[in-house]
């Protein structure tokens, strides 16, 4: 009897599947069961509407505490919302709203601790041009892609892995640190560790400072590799001294930064550097769940003739396999080809592994996240939602973009972040001094970085990532840089006179302030006689001594020049007719909302809250 041929069974996919609906969370902002629930920072106006309270009541809460620089557009801090809620007898709770439009940027995986395993650290090498970044990466990779950094451009997939002591390390291999900032501007926190390359014979240079600014702004730990120590004139101690002003010092100098000295060309110090990276990785315990559908970040992308859109991605969670359906922002597709940095075909990739993939319907952008799902239908729907989000974002005005440059610092004060570029160091110091002497209540400045030389693409990318304004002094700005700034919604201000820059900066700072509101008295009336009404309470027969009394206006009751109650004019009558206002030297009947203990000779003062000019 002939046996029927058996087919090879498709292996069972053991990865835990992502159920999109379980990660979506629509949050209704408002009061529920005595708890005020919100998702994002709220202005006073928004908060008042959500808790069904008049804006004036919220503003008066701050006025009573001596805080006058607030208005209906003021963004409330967490502490202020809590304080207001307690004042209103409410508890409060902040929750995150996750929709299909923002899922890729906000998904929080519910991995169990026992499912997490150690993953390789992801490292970016940064530093000044010609200080040896590419040579160091080549030395680590044990190849020689280029011997002249100034003319050489990295040609492989943008990342690779090396093994040291049976431990893997992933290096992001880019021509500079622009990609690092580009990804950060998109909210992609990919890098675990930055290796800062400094030439021992050259010391700290402008791009070294830029790299430090980028790393610190991203809150990423730094390892300093002092390169070219084989050259005459190389001085390790001088580099340590120069870099100490950036709060980067070795343990022997009282700091906690790891310093390694060596020579990339001679492959000296490489093992020590890799050991330092693994030590830092062990301290920080980088982990991920490999037994799940894939999630990761794009580091490079391009259109490859014959293969279509390609993307180099690094897996952050789960395992990516050939045949997986993935969504990368507005792009989606099925992974048809997956290769490592050497062009070898792979069938799967685990956390921290960099791979190049093909099979997408469009070219994604660096910094975009990808997510693997069970079906093509699911990834297409998610991609369509993301496209809708992009269309909405295109309608944001430049004014809205500018408003985002204002942030609240740790002291609750509004802060305008600046990047300053000047022709010479003397001008730079004068500008920094002039800015430090600007004193405007309720708003301050923070210099993200200040350096000499023309504005570069890196400056624009840092400004975009940190929501900063760029100030240019005695420098020309190329059309290329202006176009880039416009596309990234970065504001560049150019000056030749310092006092003019200070004047404009003061106006900007005042413009960043929320309009200040103050109380303005409309009129006063003295109570002469009282009537009691069974339905509406006490009616105060009054005489308007100044200004006018207006229905629904805010008011306060004064007795012996002391404010005893604040409310509003609930009802206003002239003789037998209900009216909206009563002028000076007229008699009227007044009902103060929710207040019946008014007495003869009390003063009813009517006022409004008006905007005050700040300059």
From Swiss-Prot:
Limits of the tr-type G domain: 118-285
Principal location listed in the UniProt entry: cytoplasm
One of the record's GO molecular function terms: translation initiation factor activity
Ranges where the record places region G5: 263-265
CDD domains per the UniProt record, alphabetical: IF2_eIF5B, IF2_mtIF2_II, mtIF2_IVc
Keyword Cytoplasm attached: yes
Family under the similarity heading: Belongs to the TRAFAC class translation factor GTPase superfamily. Classic translation factor GTPase family. IF-2 subfamily.
Listed NCBIfam families: IF-2 (TIGR00487), small_GTP (TIGR00231)
List of residues binding GTP: 127-134, 173-177, 227-230
Annotated GO CC locations: cytosol
UniProt keyword Cytoplasm present: yes
Function per UniProt: One of the essential components for the initiation of protein synthesis. Protects formylmethionyl-tRNA from spontaneous hydrolysis and promotes its binding to the 30S ribosomal subunits. Also involved in the hydrolysis of GTP during the formation of the 70S ribosomal complex.
Keywords: Cytoplasm, GTP-binding, Initiation factor, Nucleotide-binding, Protein biosynthesis
Residue span of region G2: 152-156
G1 as annotated region, ranges: 127-134
Region annotation (G3) ranges: 173-176
Subcellular location: Cytoplasm
Entry-linked SUPFAM superfamilies: Initiation factor IF2/eIF5b, domain 3, P-loop containing nucleoside triphosphate hydrolases, Translation proteins
Name of the protein: Translation initiation factor IF-2
Chain spans, region G4: 227-230
InterPro entries in UniProt: EF-G-like_DII, IF2_II, IF2_N, P-loop_NTPase, Small_GTP-bd, T_Tr_GTP-bd_dom, TF_IF2_bacterial-like, TIF_IF2
Higher taxonomy: Bacteria, Bacillati, Mycoplasmatota, Mycoplasmoidales, Mycoplasmoidaceae
